[in-house]
Amino acid sequence: MFWFKNVMIYRLTSPLSLESSSLEEQLRQTKFSPCSQSDISKFGWSSPLSGSELLHFSQGKQFLLVSHKEDKLLPTNVIKKETEERIAVLEEKEARKLKKTEKQAIKDDVVAMLLPRAFSKHQFTAIWLDLDAQLVYVDAGSSKRAEDTLALLRKTLGSLPVVPISFALLPSEVMTNWIAKGHTPNWLSLLEEAELKSFDTDSVIRCKRQDLESEEIAQHLQAGKFVTKLAIDWENHFSCVLNEDATLSRVKFADEVREKNDDILKEDIAQRFDADFLLMTEELKLFTQKMIEEFGGIKERI
């Protein structure tokens, strides 16, 4: 099961509905295929469930997809060295300086020569569509990685009107008040890690193994710094770092959660996957609702 380790949430700005069979047909048009000897990169959809040929997994209006990106690893220093050597030999032979286009052609030849021997890097990115709430969750630690997968889905579906979720209250201000005013919600506890930022001076303070209720932290907040990252624990559910853009990083589900389906035999991969997906999505749905409440509701963009 693709237990999310990072969470980036997007809101659909126009209603989206999907039907399993037609979605599968669309996904097959952009199915992942491995790099050939001449390819430097490939990007497409892979099956979320090991051993299944389906390119999506669904439960009612919940859909899970997994993008698969393969990049050939070509060391830039090797390409540069080989290219420069070839250029030097040709310039000496012809007693002239090569044009920019000629140098690029030589570089392209070097890349083509190295590609068949290059190692591959594979990257899988899970994306969950909660069409009941019209929200999209991406397991990505960077906006670029999330946007790449969303762009692939947009290409697959023909349209995907989404924006990053935003709230009536700024998460950084709310998190700052949790610490400065002792307004931490009773359903979560603060861990000893945070990032404080001054938007006037761009100064940044990163705290680890630090009592966030200490006088030292209080002084930083009184001086005008805001909390931009905060490690939190939702007891018996999961811990994570909550960021100022409401994304979650380093999500770690509690053992109590991950072990709930241990009564299902390991050999029954499909049933365990189904149960774990339901479990994970219910946890994240509940947390999202709590975030919406704490941050004053979803802000509808014009």
UniProtKB/Swiss-Prot annotation:
Pfam families: RdgC. It is found in: Cytoplasm, Nucleoid. Keywords: Cytoplasm, DNA recombination. InterPro entries: RdgC. GO terms for biological process: DNA recombination; regulation of DNA recombination. Its main location: cytoplasm. One of its GO terms (cellular component) is bacterial nucleoid. GO terms for molecular function: double-stranded DNA binding. It comes from the Bacteria. May be involved in recombination. HAMAP family: RdgC. Belongs to the RdgC family. This is Recombination-associated protein RdgC.
